[in-house]
Every structure is written in structure tokens, then in C-alpha cells.
Amino acid sequence: MRGTTNGADDMSGELELSILGVAGKERPDGAVDININSSRGEINGILHTCEGQPGAVIYVGGALGGLDGPADGLYPKLARELSGPGGMTGLRLHYRQPGEFEECVLDVLGGVSFLRGVGAQRVVLVGHSFGAAVVIKAGELSDAVIGVAALSPQLYGTRTVERLAPRSLLLVHGTADRVLDAEASRDIHARAKEPKRLELYDGAGHSLRSCAEELFELAKSWLLETIASGANETENDNAV
């Protein structure tokens, strides 16, 4: 896949990442440690497979990377819960070069390409903090992406968020975030096109730990609804 970049927003100079191979090793919990060998280095992650389902989610962390996400391990909780019957495959992805915006966008696009290669037809992206801007940009660049959830997002990298439409956008922020003010989500929401949704949690900080249970339920329902709406659109397109 190819991304283009001249700064985080314009993405006008070309960058390219090709997948050369994939290796996997099953974990005791049934998930799979995934190593994606790319033309720009190795991308590692944990895959939670949902057999026979066409929907998939990629989860990415903040500027330091990581696999667990905010809110006391939101990502593994969601990935395990949603990999059951009628759910969706989840890929918890770690960046090759944490904090390097364009490279991290390419990592997410590489994850999308991998998921498409194993049968996913519709992909949703979830990111926290720095990673929220990463998934917004990656969503703009991939036709396979049907929705993006941005948790406690930064503004840098989101200037062209209007290009995300018609993909669904969920923005979540805590009103007591002292790392990235909730005004960032308000600003992104104001510039984004429909369909979009903004959820603010009163008193929650950057990690969203104090609203972990509410966030889990919100994210779960939104992911299921977004994947289902993507399926309905596909059926309508096929009927035309």
C-alpha cells in the first residue's frame, strides 16, 4: 500500500510499504502473535480471529505504541469480547517507529492490507491520543476502512478530517484531560462531516480510566453498529 506525505496533514509526497510475508504463533489464550514483514521493517501485533465474519478492527496506542490501549486495557477487553460468534476479528498493532506519524500511518495501512488478505471486507480503526490522529489519517487514505474511533485525540494530523467522510467517526474525550484538552475533540468534530459522534466524559482524564466501563460499552456497541451498517451498504450496492 502507498501513503503520501509532506507533513502529517497534506500527505503529498509518496511513501510506500509492501508486505513481504507474515508469521504467526498461537498464544495460550487462543490469540495469535503476528509478525508482518514489510518493506519498511517488522510490524508486530496480536490477532484475535473471528472465523467466518467479514468485519475487522485495528487497535493502536499513543505515541509510545503498546497493545493495551487506554482505560485499563480497553483493547484486549474489546478484542476478546468481539471475537466471539457474530463479532469481528481484532488486530492489536504495535508501531515499528512509535511517535513517527507518517510511519505509524503506514503501519496501520499495512494492518488493513493484512486483514484484507485474510478475508476482512470491512475494517474499523481505533486509536488513542497520538494514535487517534494516526487512525483518522489512515482512514482518509483507505477505501477498506468504514469507520474510525478517536479516543482522546491530538489535533496534529487531523487538519483534513473532512476527507474521512462518508466513513463513520466517533470522538471520545474526558473533560479533565490535562494532556490533550477536550477542545481538540470539539474542534475535530466541528470540522468533520457526517456521520460523526462526539462523547465527552465529565471528569475523565487522558487515560479515560475513570470511565472505563462506560467506554467499553460505548465502543463495543459502536463497533458492532458500524460493522453492521457497512454490511447493509454492501448488500444495497450489490442489489443495484
Task: Please provide the spans of the model-predicted regions.
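N-terminal cap/lid segment of alpha/beta-hydrolase-fold proteins
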Residues: R2-G52
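Short, surface-exposed "cap/lid" segments of acyl-processing enzymes
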Residues: R40-E42, C50-G90
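Alpha/beta-hydrolase active-site loop
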Residues: G99-V118
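Primarily recognizes the serine-hydrolase "nucleophile elbow" in alpha/beta-hydrolase
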Residues: V112-R167
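Short beta-strand/loop motif that positions the catalytic acidic residue
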Residues: L164-A165, L170-H173, D177
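Short alpha-helix in the alpha/beta-hydrolase fold that links the catalytic acid
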Residues: D181-A190
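Catalytic histidine neighborhood in serine/cysteine hydrolases
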Residues: R191-S207
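Catalytic histidine-centered segment of alpha/beta-hydrolase-like enzymes
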Residues: A204-F216
